[in-house]
């Protein structure tokens, strides 16, 4: 046996539910769209959000916590999260001091995070700045 998979279509939801139940003291799972947030919403600081394709757990969700991410948006296996996931996560953790998206340099991640940033600027009048650093 190489993998523990009940149903292929449920793998992301089951994985997130398992992670959230094991770390219920730290994170809250939001479904439809899928994203996780810190239990203790940070106040008076810039909200930090990241995400990316699932399949490398606990890559994004494992960085949620004090002094680290406020939210993580896991996409499907090796697929970028949707702009709707990022928008919902941003709305959940925004504390009035701005939002910083940490984006890895994958075309889908860059495109979808940029779309989410544009949606935020239109729907919530949150200013938008862009910085790209090739690493």
Predicted segments with their positions:
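Short Gly/Thr/Asp-enriched flexible loops that form oxyanion-binding sites at enzyme active sites
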Residues: 110-123
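Gly/Ser/Thr-rich loops at beta-strand to alpha-helix junctions
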Residues: 53-58, 104-113
């Amino acid at each position: 046996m190489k993998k523990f998979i009940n149903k292929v279509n449920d793998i992301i939801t089951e994985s997130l539910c398992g992670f959230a139940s094991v770390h219920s003291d730290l994170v809250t799972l939001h479904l439809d769209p899928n994203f996780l947030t810190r239990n203790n919403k940070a106040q008076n600081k810039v909200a930090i959000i990241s995400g990316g394709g699932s399949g490398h757990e606990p890559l994004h969700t494992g960085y949620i916590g004090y002094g680290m991410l406020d939210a993580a948006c896991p996409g499907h296996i090796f697929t970028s999260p949707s702009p709707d996931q990022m928008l919902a996560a941003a709305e959940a953790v925004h504390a009035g001091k701005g939002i910083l998206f940490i984006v890895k340099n994958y075309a889908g991640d860059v495109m979808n995070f940029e779309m989410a940033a544009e949606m935020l600027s239109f729907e919530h009048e949150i200013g938008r700045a862009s910085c790209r650093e090739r690493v």
